Amino acid sequence: MLRRKDAGNVPNTVDAAQEKHVPVIEVKENLVTVKVGSVTHPMLDEHYIEWISLETKEGNQRKELKPGADPVAVFALAPSDDVVAAYAYCNLHGLWKAEK
């Protein structure tokens, strides 16, 4: 039996507000900013983004988040690297993905 939290292991498949969960990727030179949602996701003790991950052609980077923090992460890219996708994990609604 899956717990609600585990139901979101396939990205973007949980019935929840996409505008608050799908990562938004912004690339400026070698810095990548990933914001969770086009509408800011709540960061409450009972409902928050646990982590944000950036997948690149050369690997992955991840930032752990806590309740009360901004649901944003900034990652640095090597000159030869490119963004593939960003992921965010909501403690209630599971895994969300955006491709670049």
Please report, for each region that a protein language model flagged, where it lies by residue.
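Short, aromatic- and glycine-rich surface loops/edge beta-strands on solvent-exposed regions
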Residues: D82-L92
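Exposed beta-strand and adjacent loop surfaces of beta-rich binding modules
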Residues: L31, I49-W51, V83
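Solvent-exposed serine/threonine-rich low-complexity stretches and specific carbohydrate-binding patches
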Residues: E58-G68
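Short acidic/polar inter-strand loop motif in beta-rich domains
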Residues: N91-E99
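Extended low-complexity, serine/threonine- and proline-enriched intrinsically disordered segments
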Residues: Y48-E58
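Short amphipathic, basic-aromatic surface patches that mediate peripheral association
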Residues: V36-L44
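Short strand-edge motifs at loop-to-beta-strand transitions and within beta-strands
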Residues: P71-F75
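Transition segment at domain starts
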Residues: M1-L31
